């Protein structure tokens, strides 16, 4: 005697699932787009139901929505994460949004006065944001004699200025200086402080400070190893020795 109950249960579940999709009213439905999901390898035409700002359903069946957007001929995909941006205001973020970027991170150069910058972006940013610790700035700050310039950079940070040229030109005034042991120790303290303020690793763009004593860079990498944080390196020179310095 055949037992049809398991098959009947499966069919009922399929029917109930399809019926539930048609009953639920999603906040937004993206209809008919080419859905690409790198995690599951999905690459097909689907309808996407969004509920409470989250993707609640991806289906071949029509979905009901308070707002339905026909995205036929367009790609629907997770937002891109850009790891190397220098723009830090909503002007740049608007362009990034149009490119499909939903997270923009300043990791190669980092951001000065990092804690203050995070505060200045709270509730204002259009997309997700973050930054690494700006090693050249923490070094510049530790030298001591540039306090007036450090303070002036604070105002640029709070105002959300995106003038990377003004910032780098200010900080790089100390690029060729050999710093004291005390200043080096203070640099490491400054880096730790900024990491605690939310720094996503340490930016080490030594290519902009190529005359820096190798021990300075070594100590920064050593600190990163002790704290188990990532280093984003713009190497000293375009050669093998500089690569070895970064990975030693």
Regions picked out by a protein language model, each given a short descriptive name:
Residues 79-86:
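Metallo-beta-lactamase
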Residues 1-23:
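Bacterial Sec-dependent N-terminal signal peptides
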Residues 86-88, 109, 134-138, 207-209, ...:
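Active-site beta-loop-alpha junctions enriched in small/polar residues
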Residues 71-76, 91-203, 221-224:
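Divalent-metal coordination cores built from histidine and acidic residues
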Residues 22-29, 35-77:
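Histidine-rich, glycine-flanked metal-binding segment
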Residues 30, 67-69, 81, 105, ...:
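Hydrophobic/aromatic beta-strand patches that form the interior of the parallel beta-sheet core
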Residues 86, 183-184, 213:
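A conditional alpha-helix N-cap/helix-loop micro-motif detector
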Residues 202-248:
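Active-site core of metal-dependent hydrolases
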């Amino acid at each position: 005697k055949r037992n049809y109950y398991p098959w009947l249960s499966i069919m009922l579940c399929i029917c109930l699932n399809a019926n539930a999709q048609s009953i639920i009213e999603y906040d937004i439905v993206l209809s008919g787009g080419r859905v690409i999901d790198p995690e599951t390898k999905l690459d097909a035409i689907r309808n996407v139901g969004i509920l409470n700002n989250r993707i609640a359903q991806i289906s071949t069946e029509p979905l009901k929505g308070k707002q339905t957007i026909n995205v036929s001929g367009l790609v629907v995909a997770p937002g891109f994460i850009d790891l190397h941006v220098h723009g830090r205001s909503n002007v740049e973020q608007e362009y990034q949004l149009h490119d499909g970027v939903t997270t923009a991170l300043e990791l190669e150069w980092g951001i000065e006065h990092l804690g203050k910058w995070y505060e200045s972006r709270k509730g204002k940013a259009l997309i997700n944001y973050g930054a690494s610790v700006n090693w050249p700035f923490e070094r510049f700050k530790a030298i001591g004699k540039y306090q007036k310039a450090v303070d002036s950079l604070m105002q640029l940070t709070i105002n959300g200025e995106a003038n990377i040229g003004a910032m780098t030109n200010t900080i790089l005034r100390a690029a060729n200086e050999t710093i004291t042991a005390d200043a080096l120790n203070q640099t490491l303290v400054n880096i730790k402080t900024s990491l605690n303020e939310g720094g996503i690793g340490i930016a080490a763009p030594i290519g902009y400070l190529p005359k820096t004593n190798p021990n300075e860079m070594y100590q920064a990498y050593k600190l990163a190893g002790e704290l188990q944080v990532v280093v984003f390196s713009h190497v000293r020179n375009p050669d093998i020795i500089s690569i070895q310095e970064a990975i030693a």
